Amino acid sequence: MLGILMTLVVRHYATVRGFVAKPKSDRWHKRPTAMMGGVAIFLATIIMYALFVPPTRDSLALMGGSTFLFLVGLVDDTINIKPYQKLIGQLIGAAILVSFGLTLPITGYALVDIWITTFWIIGITNAINLLDNMDGLAAGISAIASIALGISFAVNGQMTELAFVAV
């Protein structure tokens, strides 16, 4: 709900301030479209995280790494940085997370799990970025992913996580 509200507020702000993507060949929209949808999603996520997740070493590391990745994306959207610069930023963001031990425990081998986590973070970040060429597509896919996570949390009895995703 907060994500929807923030999207409406940020969309209005972007339109009034002229932060719009003009139609061009690599985009699907036919008229100027408000940008900054990622700002709305990021703000909603950070607000809910700050309100409902206790400040622990892991939660602060996750918030810090996510904020860094958000800023890399924001800089890219504003001044169009080179792909290698964006990749370096994404590597730093992933390094922030894995340096605090936040990894996907898939193989049981720490070094392999660090690499898998790093590639996953960079892959998801770029996948969402690539979807962002059509108004609402990235947000829609993210909403579907959130619903899937919510179902998984409910099935596994993870009510705190379910409440966070629901908001």
List each model region and its residues.
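"…together with the soluble PPM/PP2C metallo-phosphatase catalytic core" -> "…together
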Residues: 1-167
